[in-house]
């Protein structure tokens, strides 16, 4: 596979402490520059609507970087300035699933993406 024009997006499962909530994310993705990626995060074992779901990422050799978050019951997301206009975070209360979509992908977006509560 030619990796020159493709970037790897890896997502990882995270387990919340409160109420033994488990967050399960969608799998790894390979995307072309300029395209977008949408990652899902399904919660189980606790109340979904009332607690904030945050999205963070970790690029190779770097620390964690907060991208944004949402409280499902309110429906309005907050974003880090760096990602304004490129990231969209949503939540579907009916399926207890949060989503993070990142558009206009660049090589610098190669990272492990996590949802957390």
From Swiss-Prot:
Signal peptide stretch: 1-19
Q: Which SMART domains match?
A: IGv
One Pfam family hit: V-set
Q: Where is this region: Complementarity-determining-1?
A: 45-52
Q: At what positions is Pyrrolidone carboxylic acid found?
A: 20
Question: Region Framework-1: what ranges?
Answer: 20-44
Q: Provide the GO MF annotations for this entry.
A: antigen binding
Sequence ranges assigned to domain Ig-like in this UniProt record: 20-117
Region Complementarity-determining-3, residue ranges: 116-117
Alphabetically sorted, this entry's keywords are: Adaptive immunity, Cell membrane, Disulfide bond, Immunity, Immunoglobulin, Immunoglobulin domain, Membrane, Pyrrolidone carboxylic acid, Secreted, Signal
User: What function does the entry list?
Assistant: V region of the variable domain of immunoglobulin heavy chains that participates in the antigen recognition. Immunoglobulins, also known as antibodies, are membrane-bound or secreted glycoproteins produced by B lymphocytes. In the recognition phase of humoral immunity, the membrane-bound immunoglobulins serve as receptors which, upon binding of a specific antigen, trigger the clonal expansion and differentiation of B lymphocytes into immunoglobulins-secreting plasma cells.
Subunit-structure text: Immunoglobulins are composed of two identical heavy chains and two identical light chains; disulfide-linked.
Per its record, how is this protein called by name? Immunoglobulin heavy variable 1-69D
User: Origin organism of this chain?
Assistant: Homo sapiens
Q: What are the top taxonomic ranks of the organism?
A: Eukaryota, Metazoa, Chordata, Craniata, Vertebrata
């Amino acid at each position: 596979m030619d990796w020159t024009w493709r970037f790897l997006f890896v997502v990882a499962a995270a387990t919340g402490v409160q109420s033994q909530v488990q967050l399960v994310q969608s799998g790894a993705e390979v995307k072309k520059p300029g395209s977008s990626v949408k990652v899902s995060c399904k919660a189980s074992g606790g109340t979904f609507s009332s607690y904030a779901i945050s999205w963070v990422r970790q690029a190779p050799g770097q620390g964690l970087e907060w991208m944004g978050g949402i409280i499902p019951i309110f429906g309005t997301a907050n974003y880090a300035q760096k990602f304004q206009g490129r990231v969209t975070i949503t939540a579907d209360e009916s399926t207890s699933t949060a989503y993070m979509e990142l558009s206009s992908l660049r090589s610098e977006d190669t990272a492990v993406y996590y949802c957390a509560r």
